[in-house]
A protein has these predicted regions:
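Membrane-proximal structural modules of membrane-associated proteins and complexes
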Residues: 1-133
Length: 133
């Protein structure tokens, strides 16, 4: 029964959108003009999940399978290991649909190809998506 409660309390990221942005904050159609990558999602309503401050982690994997990570970035627990993250964001979760937006400031040369984004909270993978630059 406790496993069922844990499963029911798991958060879920829905409506995930990833937008490469230029310096004006508009959609960037060119790799070299991308200065930010915006990741937006909604944490779905869940009356079973604990309310309060939640930390969300985002991992962005490049086409060559390397993780985008800033120097000195931390790690978080997942499946018994500490794994590095690209972006971390804390929000107040009240059990209702909650929008979350994260930004990756582009300071490295980006490769053309498909990038994968994975979102985590409370030690669980809560959503994933991909985008192509």
């Amino acid at each position: 029964l406790s496993d069922r409660v844990k499963l029911a309390a798991k958060l879920d990221a829905t409506r995930i959108s990833i937008t490469p942005m230029d310096k004006r904050g508009k959609l960037s159609k060119k790799l070299e003009k991308t200065v930010n990558i915006q990741i937006h999602f909604t944490v779905a309503k869940n009356v079973t999940a604990a309310v309060g401050e939640k930390t969300f982690y985002c991992r962005i994997t490049q086409p060559n399978e390397e993780l985008l990570v800033k120097p000195g970035a931390g790690t978080f627990p997942f499946e018994g290991k500490q794994i590095p993250y690209s972006i971390r964001r804390e929000i107040e979760y009240n059990g209702e649909d909650t929008p979350v937006t994260m930004y990756w400031p582009v300071e490295e040369s980006l490769q053309s190809g498909t990038y994968r984004v994975k979102l985590f909270a409370d030690g669980n993978l809560i959503g994933q998506a991909s985008f192509t630059l």
